[in-house]
Design a protein with these regions (language model features):
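Short catalytic micro-motifs in class I SAM-dependent methyltransferases
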Residues: 25, 37, 41-43
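Class I SAM-dependent methyltransferase SAM/SAH-binding core
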Residues: 1-28
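Short alpha-helix
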Residues: 81-103, 122-129
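Conserved Class I S-adenosyl-L-methionine
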Residues: 102-176
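A short, conserved alpha-helix within the catalytic core of class I
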Residues: 43-58
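Short strand-turn motif at the edge of the Rossmann-like AdoMet-binding core
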Residues: 43, 64-68, 80
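Conserved beta-strand signature within the Rossmann-like core of class I S-adenosyl-L-methionine
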Residues: 57-73
């Protein structure tokens, strides 16, 4: 389930048998029958995920969380707060929810048509209120892009964690 129609169309084009793509708000679209499994990729607070999963899933849930603590595209050091693997582990320990976790990395880079597009990207995603990157600093972050159409690339190896949780281990109080 995703709120973005393009994501759903892309998934449907490569659909795996037995997987259903749904466009909408996960909290508003409660299934008639609980799902066998749910995947929450870089999705919200752990408490919200547990609440949704307890109501909507009878099997395993998979949480993909960032395994770093600060925003990657900000000029200054800006905390991600409770949207990290460390925060998720703390919540699961506090609530006594057993889980397994696997750490891995994935390339989450961004291609750009121009240096100006890269500058707009950094301006948009900079969460630092007091610091900005100069044009030269931005250019220094870029490598050769994948094609003539996209001559610039910002490599970004993202450290992630995959948490696996049985929904039966989530207390009924979490579903409220």
């Amino acid at each position: 389930m995703d709120a973005g129609e393009l994501a759903i169309k892309t998934l449907e084009a490569h659909l795996i048998k037995g997987v259903t793509a749904i466009c909408g708000d996960v909290e508003a679209l409660t299934p008639k029958e609980p799902y066998d499994a749910m995947v929450f990729c870089l999705f919200g607070r752990t408490e919200d995920t547990l609440r949704i999963a307890r109501k909507q899933c009878r099997g395993k849930i998979f949480l993909v969380k960032r395994d770093y603590s600060h925003h990657r595209f900000s000029a200054g050091k800006v905390s991600l707060g409770e949207y990290t693997a460390g925060s998720t582990e703390a919540v699961l320990h506090e609530k006594g929810v057993p889980y397994t976790v696997e750490r891995f990395t994935a390339e989450f880079g961004q291609s750009f048509r121009s240096l100006e597009a890269a500058e707009r990207f950094f301006a948009l995603y900079n969460r630092s209120r007091s610091e900005t990157l100069s044009k030269d600093e931005i250019k220094a972050c870029l490598t050769a892009g994948p094609s003539e159409k996209f001559p610039y690339y910002l490599p970004h190896e993202k450290a992630l964690c995959l948490f696996t949780i049985e929904t039966a281990a989530i207390s009924k109080e979490e579903a409220v």
